[in-house]
Amino acid sequence: MFKGYIEGYYSRRLAIDAFKDLKAPISHYFYGPKEDIYLRHRWKEIDKNLKRRILPKKIKQVYCVSPTSDFFKDSKKNLSFLKKKLSHAVEKVGFDEIAIFFDDIDVTNFGQEAADKDLGKKHAEVLNEVSFHFSKQKNIWFCPSIYNLSLSKGIFDEGYLGGLKENLNKHIVIFWTGDNVISEKINNSSL
């Protein structure tokens, strides 16, 4: 099991000193704050001022990108942008690992292909291509559009997750939060 801190919310960044005060040791720090415009709204652009945080060496730093819902309008070109951006973060800036977050994006305007399984398949294809491109990476992390049981009801039902299950490379690490966005515990029935 991995223990980490995900900076992926809409608020102030965690101060460096806070890492010293954590009650439990962590192995990973995920840099993906929603307010960083280069991770979401301007995700096709490379942030020339991007820097790793100064953290204890034992903590792996993961660069997280959240492509917006327009990703699939020109997926071949956008996949090229994505690989370039992730390469910059790993090779030039020195991040240890990478992640793609497809959570919190509006997927209702995709049209017919958003019908359940197809969207899961499309997300899996993107992750598989990134995984192949970064085959030397220890971990490729993924937060799907549906990342807990409470979100799996309604329009997507189980189709989206089925599309992922059938197509996603088994080496990609998936974020799953159990029954709810914040779950006290995750047991087998939550998986």
Task: Cite the ranges covered by each PLM segment.
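Feature activates predominantly on carbohydrate-active enzymes
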Residues: 1-82, 92-96, 103, 135-136
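Catalytic-core regions of glycoside hydrolase
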Residues: 6-8, 27, 107-191
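Alpha-helical scaffolding within the catalytic cores
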Residues: 14-17, 48-52, 84-85, 156-162, ...
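Glycine-rich loops and low-complexity Gly/Arg-rich segments
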Residues: 53-55, 86-89, 164-168
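Hydrophobic or amphipathic alpha-helical targeting/insertion segments
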Residues: 75, 81-110, 114-116, 122, ...
